[in-house]
Every structure is written in structure tokens, then in C-alpha cells.
A protein has these predicted regions:
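Extracellular beta-rich repeat passengers
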Residues: 3-15, 22-23, 27-162, 166-294
Length: 294
């Protein structure tokens, strides 16, 4: 499957499903026309939109005021697509099966703050299978989760130009066996964060609080901080190695709510947890006024 221009994207709406199951020897590939024609290079990014999957699983921020997050009436408009909504109250919602699947040269900014990622998982439920997936050379995030409960395994993110992993709007899930190498070639903008986590509306009071666990991650950052955790969510990283360039730091935690004690807010499980994690950066963390080393 290929797209011809930046705005081309495949959108799987709520109530629909995608079944894209390749094999290790013959993965399913979504790419750009230029790649099919043989004109893409190692620097190519943003040659088509990407894959957007919309589900009915709980999210943390609703478009309509007065609607309770996590209920059937809570929905939000997804970035990059007109009149497309996600969210609901079905944690076990099933948007299909994706296995042995690769996205190449995708991602497109329609306007500031309105971008298509390599893969967008918005309100996708844990009934969905998401395994053996690679996103290569996206001009925006590799994969962005907007709420939802879908879990993933065997994820490879290479050469992406913004965040490789971006989780927000009350995403609750576990992802295991992840490899990340940031974009770092001559003339490229370079990747942003290996993992950026936050909230859907910038607040720290989402009543469907983000609770995200990554395990068995090997990541090589390009520069800056490798991981940015903020927004008062609950985060855990286990059995992982995070390495960075000479100028990079491994961890930046912002906001007092992000390190508050368990029980201090709705669904609050406490500060970020790191178990058996090896940090190999020029500095282990950013010691700033948001959250200090103390």
C-alpha cells in the first residue's frame, strides 16, 4: 500500500477494523509512492500521511464540556483528520489485528499542532492486536497513543523526526520489546524524544490518568533529553537500556504532579518507577526548576 502525498492517510474509524497480518519473511508494508518508484533516500521523510486507528476505549480529555472521561459520551477529534473522533467507554474495544507490519516515510504537518504521525492509535482498546511493528522515517512521531488501552509487543522505531514514542490523553497500556534509534543523519532535523508523555489538555487532573508501562526497551537518543515525563501521569520503565549522544541527558521529569505520592489524585499510583534500567547519557537527568534532583 502506498500514498502519493503528505495528506494521504489510511483512517480506520470507530466501529471498523483493520486486519493487516504479515509474516517475518513477508511483512505488510505501507510506504510512499517515491519509495515504490525507487526515488526515496536515507533522508526521506513525510512523503505521505500514515495510519490512523480510532477506537472506543477510554480517554482522558473530552471535546464536549461536562462529559465524563472514560464514558461512552466522551470523545475527542483526532489530529490530522477532519471530522474524525475517538474515545468511549469500551476498554476491551477491538480495532483489529496488526502483526509484522511496517510504515515507511510517513508523517505530515497539516498545520502547527495538527500532524499525522507514522501510526496514530487514538482510543484504541486492548482487544486490538498490535505486534511486530516498525515505523521508519516519519516526519512527526513514530507512534502516538491518544488515550486507549491497547498493548503492544515487538516494536521498532527508526529514523523518526519528532518523538519516537508519544503517549497522552489518558493512555493506559503496556508495551514490551521495543527498539528505538533516533534520526541523526547529516542535514536532518534529528529526533526529539525517545519517549514523551503528557496529558491531552495540558492539565494534571485528567480523571482517566495516563498509566503507561514500557519494558525491555533499548533506545539510542540523538540529543537533548531522551525521556520527558510530565502532566501528572503514572509511568514505569523496566529492564531497559537508554543511551544518548554526547550532549544528551537521559531523563527529564516536569511538574510536581508527576512525582506526587500515590493517592494524591484520582487514579494516582505515585511517582515514575524505574526498575533495572541502565542510563548511559552524558548526564542521567535534567536538574531544573520543574523537578530538581532532590
Amino acid at each position: 500500500v502506498f500514498g502519493s502525498s503528505g495528506a494521504d492517510a489510511l483512517v480506520v474509524n470507530r466501529g471498523s477494523q483493520i486486519f493487516a497480518e504479515g509474516t517475518a519473511a513477508e511483512p505488510i508494508v505501507f510506504t510512499s509512492r517515491a519509495n515504490v518508484e525507487g526515488t526515496s533516500t536515507a533522508e526521506s521523510i513525510g512523503q505521505w500521511g500514515g495510519l490512523v486507528i480510532l477506537g472506543r476505549a477510554p480517554i482522558g480529555t473530552c471535546s464536549a464540556g461536562g462529559t465524563t472521561p472514560g464514558t461512552a459520551g466522551c470523545q475527542a477529534a483526532v489530529e490530522g483528520v477532519t471530522n474524525a473522533y475517538y474515545g468511549g467507554g469500551l476498554a476491551n474495544d477491538n480495532s483489529g489485528r496488526i502483526k509484522y507490519f511496517q510504515i515507511r516515510y510517513s508523517g505530515f504537518a497539516l498545520s502547527a499542532g495538527n500532524e499525522l504521525n507514522g501510526i496514530t492509535l487514538a482510543g484504541v482498546g486492548r482487544g486490538t492486536t498490535f505486534e511486530y511493528v516498525q515505523v521508519h522515517n516519519s516526519s512527526d512521531d513514530g507512534i502516538e497513543w491518544f488515550g486507549g488501552t491497547v498493548n503492544g509487543k515487538y516494536i521498532v522505531l527508526t529514523g523518526n523526526d519528532d518523538d519516537s514514542i508519544d503517549t497522552d490523553n489518558g493512555y493506559t497500556g503496556v508495551n514490551q520489546f521495543v527498539i528505538v534509534t533516533h534520526r541523526a543523519t547529516a542535514g536532518a532535523a534529528g529526533g526529539d524524544y525517545v519517549w514523551e508523555a503528557g496529558t491531552g489538555d495540558g492539565s494534571v487532573n485528567e480523571t482517566v490518568r495516563q498509566d503507561t508501562h514500557f519494558a525491555n526497551v533499548t533506545a539510542v537518543a540523538n540529543g537533548g533529553a531522551a525521556i520527558l515525563l510530565r502532566g501528572g501521569g503514572d509511568y514505569q520503565l523496566t529492564n531497559s537500556v537508554i543511551a544518548g549522544a554526547a550532549s544528551s541527558t537521559c531523563l527529564d521529569i516536569d511538574g510536581a504532579a508527576t512525582i506526587q505520592a500515590a493517592g494524591a489524585g484520582t487514579d494516582e499510583n505515585g511517582p515514575p518507577v524505574f526498575k533495572s534500567v541502565f542510563f548511559a547519557c552524558s548526564a542521567p537527568y535534567v536538574d531544573d526548576t520543574n523537578v530538581t534532583a532532590a
